[in-house]
């Protein structure tokens, strides 16, 4: 998908996949950028570990506690997380869905949810509910994000709970996202 995108814009890049493990990540990153690499995309299980190797990280990466992109600029490595922005762009441009004033349910409280929730909140939904099989994990995610995201001036109803009928069926939803 990345190579197809580059080809659409006549960008001269090589996009390949390399097998990297948590044990080899630091050496691989050092060698890649030392050899003139400009940037990389990162997937599981390395997103959280990769955060530690960026000289600077974006607010999105900080909120997600993970990065899926590291790029070189001015002799520094910058880490970012584009998961949330990618979802928003797809919803708005391809599906013509706006999130403002919508009631949204997110199923799951792992890394994918953590990566998309801040971008969803930026779009001013009416409510955002995180439901997870392990209720405590949903509650911890909500609590952590509330401590990092400025919710002042927002009328957002932000809830978290388990996958119970009482919690899930208490509301209707405009959008359900399985993360």
Q: Where are the language model's segments positioned?
A:
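Phosphate/diphosphate ligand-binding glycine-rich loop within oxidoreductases
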Residues: 1-95
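A structural signal for isolated positions on well-ordered beta-strands in alpha/beta enzyme cores
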Residues: 14-16, 105, 128-129, 159
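A short helix-to-beta-strand connector/capping loop
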Residues: 11, 35, 73, 149-160
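Short acidic low-complexity segments
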Residues: 153-173
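NAD(P)-binding Rossmann-fold cofactor-contacting core
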Residues: 123-149
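Redox-cofactor binding/interface segments in oxidoreductases and associated redox assembly factors
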Residues: 42, 177-178
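Glycine-rich adenosine-cofactor-binding loop
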Residues: 81-84, 91, 95-125, 133
């Amino acid at each position: 998908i990345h190579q197809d995108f580059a080809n659409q814009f006549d960008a001269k890049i090589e996009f390949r996949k390399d097998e990297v493990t948590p044990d080899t990540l630091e050496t691989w990153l050092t060698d890649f950028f030392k050899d003139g690499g400009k940037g990389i995309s990162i997937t599981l299980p390395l997103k959280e570990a990769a955060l530690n190797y960026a000289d600077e990280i974006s607010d999105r990466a900080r909120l997600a506690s993970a990065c899926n992109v590291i790029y070189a600029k001015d002799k520094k490595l910058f880490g970012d997380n584009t998961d949330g922005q990618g979802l928003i762009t797809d919803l708005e441009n391809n599906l013509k869905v706006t999130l403002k004033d919508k009631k949204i349910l997110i199923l799951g409280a792992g890394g994918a949810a953590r990566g998309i929730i801040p971008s969803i909140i930026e779009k001013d939904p009416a409510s955002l509910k995180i439901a997870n099989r392990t209720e405590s994990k949903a509650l911890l995610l909500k609590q952590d994000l509330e401590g990092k995201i400025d919710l002042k001036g927002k009328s957002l109803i932000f809830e978290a709970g388990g996958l119970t009928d009482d919690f899930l069926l208490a509301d209707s939803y405009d959008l359900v996202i399985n993360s």
